[in-house]
């Protein structure tokens, strides 16, 4: 097939999932690429609550991009993650935060105002039943036809993979956490 035989799509659904590192990092790279090409982008983060490196980075670039960049951090911290879970946050509070974050994501994705909407850790929110798989499917199906969507986090539902135009499974080969070392600032968060 010749290069001329290929077509382009007005928008795509991108999934970054799997047990390995790099899902959020890939989505931040996608954000940089989108903004660098003059796109309007929304970066909406589920689960994460603490001030991780990507939050600091996005907050610093927000003034540069103005109305072309929406950043929303709606998490309450790790959920169902053993000792790493937020101790003072109830299941109901986690679900409420995820629901509010979903509403922001849904509004952004369906508004037609953004070229790309990135929903970081939404797959984890679905896996832990903070929002439903039906919510995720509705987000994908109802998005504006000209809005690309990026969905990150472990455990993307296999039966929804048919809706993805690009799906990448990050595979862990080795991670220092398995040897009881905590995450490193600047590398892991």
Residue ranges and their predicted role:
Residues 154-189:
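Phosphate-binding/switch region of NTP-binding enzymes
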């Amino acid at each position: 097939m010749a290069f001329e035989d290929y077509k382009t799509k007005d928008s795509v659904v991108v999934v970054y999932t799997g047990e390995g590192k790099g899902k959020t990092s890939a989505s931040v790279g996608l954000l940089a690429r989108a903004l660098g090409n003059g796109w309007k982008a929304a970066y909406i983060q589920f689960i994460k609550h603490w001030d991780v490196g990507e939050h600091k980075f996005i907050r610093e670039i927000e003034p540069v991009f103005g109305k072309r960049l929406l950043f929303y951090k709606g998490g309450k911290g790790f959920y169902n993650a053993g000792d790493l879970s937020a101790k003072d946050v109830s299941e109901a509070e986690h679900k409420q935060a995820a629901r509010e974050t979903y509403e922001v994501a849904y509004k952004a994705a369906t508004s037609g105002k953004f070229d790309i909407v990135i929903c970081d850790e939404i797959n984890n929110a679905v896996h832990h039943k903070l929002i439903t798989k039906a919510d995720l499917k509705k987000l994908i199906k109802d998005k504006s036809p000209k809005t690309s969507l990026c969905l990150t986090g472990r455990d993307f539902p296999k039966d929804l993979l048919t809706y993805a135009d690009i799906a990448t499974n990050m595979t862990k080969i080795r991670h220092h956490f398995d040897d009881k070392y905590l995450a490193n600032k600047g590398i892991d968060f």
